[in-house]
Amino acid sequence: VYNGTRYLTEQLDSLRLQTVSPDRVLIADDCSTDESFDLIVKYIEEHGLGNWTINKNRSNFGWRKSFKLLLDLASIDDGIVFPCDQDDIWEPDKIAVMSSILEKDPSIEVLSCAVEPFYESGGKKVTVYGAVDDSKPLDDLETPVFDSKFMLVRRPGCSYAVKSSFIREIMPYWQDDFAHDGMLWRFSLLKGTLRLLNQPLIRFRRHDSNATEMRHIDKKSRVAEIGMCLRFSKVLQEYCSSNPGDYRISSAHIEHYGSVLNARLHLLVGGLKISDLGTILKYRKYELSNRSLLGDFKALISSCDSK
């Protein structure tokens, strides 16, 4: 939670009124400067929620590290963990439906439901991955394949239900600046234990202060982002090397993706070489979108203009 007083009560109500109550609810306040912490404390007291706890971070960790710490804590006991944002609204049967599917199928470690986006005043209209596919039944379960687009996270983290044993397994590979949805999506995709449910069980609020919408295209930010993606690809390779299973095809995808990232990094910090351009063209399908390389050129031109 961070400065969420505007939407918190709606989200808290949707958790409290689930048809299957959660065993416990863990909340971290990331040093909010509004009344978020006091609002939640009062809410817990008013509704007698003895299994709900809230703690305030000792400093502002940011949402990535905060989610990592909370998921680490939540996965101590065996069970199912539901990551939760501060501003969405859960359907009353979200826990019931997703828990039932996970408990019946041991091959699933991460289950993601569809989402129903809605926009507040000022909310920027963006592409929302994970909306209902009207061509499929609501109970359809898709098994995504680890391919050249493996880094593209197609569902938001607030739509996930995750077996705690899986969180414990991947926690040694988890760095503080890795987003929780990326960690959970990509590792379960790699293992073949990710499933996508077509049923919308969360109302996904979009507004002008969504953390996931705050993007920068300046050179420094793009270099940092590419560096983070390189580190992520390396930990995926480490997992492939350290765990049983046939990851030859997946490892090849990860290696090719790393080659493109290195070429993009050379473009931004040292100037593009012919060999780098060849790499980018050869493995172009590993770009998350056609805008990635264009954004690199824009950032490079912008940095040159500012000198």
Q: Can you say where each PLM-predicted feature lies in the sequence?
A:
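C-terminal subregions of glycosyltransferases and related glycan-biosynthesis enzymes
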Residues: 147-151, 156, 171, 177-179, ...
